[in-house]
């Protein structure tokens, strides 16, 4: 039986329920994590992070031609459909300049993570080129291992270590480089304690106890920073002004709608020419990203056409 997942982007490959029989053929490890819902339907044991990792491996192989994917224990295991939505809505944003999605776009992923998820999807779906930045050497090593293990990705994805504490674009965007867009899934919490509380809520919601040796948290740089999401994105906005002619669109996920007003004020303060909000929905979960540019319509058209 097939059922639509409400709200996913029209080009998202995950509108239907997971075809678990096919996914288990792609990744036989997934079989051991299958379970039955109260309605008697086959599902995956989403309370088990090993099950989620096995599902991700199958999805990335089946839909995105990523045959070899893994992440170290303790790192976030991203839900693939939601990550794909960001990429597709970003493609729509880039298409506004000329009426078509640029096939050779250059994208900067701030905080590429151990999973390297956004570049993997963006390269397969649109043939884009990615630069991924990361503060964690362990996450960088994991992402590089994924790239090296899959033919063709070395030509499409490059990684850079952010060595400057607190910096986002500084030290990553080199002189004379140009990017069609940046993307980011920023740290959400404002302290380690808040991050631990969030992980504990997730464990409770999944019916787990503290004795379950399962990690739903992620690493510090994935989950929290001083001042939380708003402070991180405001820092990004401040730095973006210095790269106004090198980047067409700066974008970032924003987890809560109530975080938008201070970000809009910050964008006014730096003189952003245009600000866009893209709403997204994955099932019951609502999300969004904001995008801002320092280029007018004609400048953006010229920017996209520069490499045609």
Curated annotation (Swiss-Prot):
Kindly report, in one word, the top-level EC class recorded for this enzyme: transferase
Query: What is catalysed by this protein?
Result: adenosine(1618) in 23S rRNA + S-adenosyl-L-methionine = N(6)-methyladenosine(1618) in 23S rRNA + S-adenosyl-L-homocysteine + H(+)
The GO terms describing molecular function are: 23S rRNA (adenine(1618)-N(6))-methyltransferase activity
Does the record bear ATP-binding in its keywords?
no
Say where the protein is mainly found. Answer: cytoplasm
Q: Which InterPro entries match?
A: METTL16/RlmF, rRNA_lsu_MeTfrase_F, SAM-dependent_MTases_sf
GO CC, sorted alphabetically, is: cytoplasm
One Pfam family here: Methyltransf_10
User: Which keywords are on file for this protein?
Assistant: Cytoplasm, Methyltransferase, rRNA processing, S-adenosyl-L-methionine, Transferase
* Biological process, per Gene Ontology: rRNA base methylation
Q: What is its EC number?
A: 2.1.1.181
Please state where this protein is localized.
Answer: Cytoplasm
Tell me which domain of life the UniProt entry assigns to the organism this sequence originates from: Bacteria
The protein's job, in short, is:
Specifically methylates the adenine in position 1618 of 23S rRNA.
Q: Please report which protein family the annotation says this sequence is part of.
A: Belongs to the methyltransferase superfamily. METTL16/RlmF family.
In Swiss-Prot or TrEMBL terms, this protein is called Ribosomal RNA large subunit methyltransferase F
């Amino acid at each position: 039986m097939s059922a639509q997942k409400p709200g996913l982007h029209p080009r998202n490959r995950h509108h239907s329920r997971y075809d678990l029989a096919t996914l288990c053929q792609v990744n036989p490890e997934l079989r051991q994590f299958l379970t039955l819902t109260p309605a008697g339907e086959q599902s995956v044991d989403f309370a088990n992070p090993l099950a989620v990792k096995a599902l991700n491996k199958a999805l990335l192989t089946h839909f995105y031609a990523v045959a070899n994917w893994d992440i170290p224990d303790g790192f976030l295991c991203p839900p693939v459909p939601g990550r794909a939505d960001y990429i597709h809505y970003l493609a729509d944003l880039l298409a506004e300049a000329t009426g078509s999605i640029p096939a050779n776009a250059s994208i900067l992923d701030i905080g590429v993570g151990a999973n390297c998820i956004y570049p993997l999807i963006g390269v397969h779906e649109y043939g884009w080129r990615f630069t991924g930045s990361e503060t964690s050497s362990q996450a960088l090593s994991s992402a590089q291992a994924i790239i090296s293990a899959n033919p063709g990705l070395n030509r499409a994805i490059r990684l850079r270590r952010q060595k400057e504490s607190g910096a986002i674009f500084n030290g990553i965007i080199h002189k004379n480089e140009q990017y069609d867009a940046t993307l980011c899934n920023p740290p959400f919490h404002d302290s380690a304690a808040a991050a631990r509380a969030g992980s504990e809520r997730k464990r409770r919601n999944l019916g787990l106890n503290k004795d379950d040796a399962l990690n739903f948290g992620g690493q510090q740089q994935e989950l929290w920073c001083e001042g939380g999401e708003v402070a991180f994105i405001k820092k990004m906005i401040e730095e973006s002004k210095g790269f106004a002619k090198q980047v067409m669109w700066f974008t970032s996920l924003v987890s809560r709608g109530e975080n938008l007003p201070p970000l809009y004020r910050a964008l006014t303060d730096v003189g952003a020419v245009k600000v866009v909000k893209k709403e997204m929905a994955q099932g019951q979960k609502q999300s969004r990203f904001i995008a801002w540019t320092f280029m007018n319509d004609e400048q953006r058209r010229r920017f996209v056409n520069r490499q045609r």
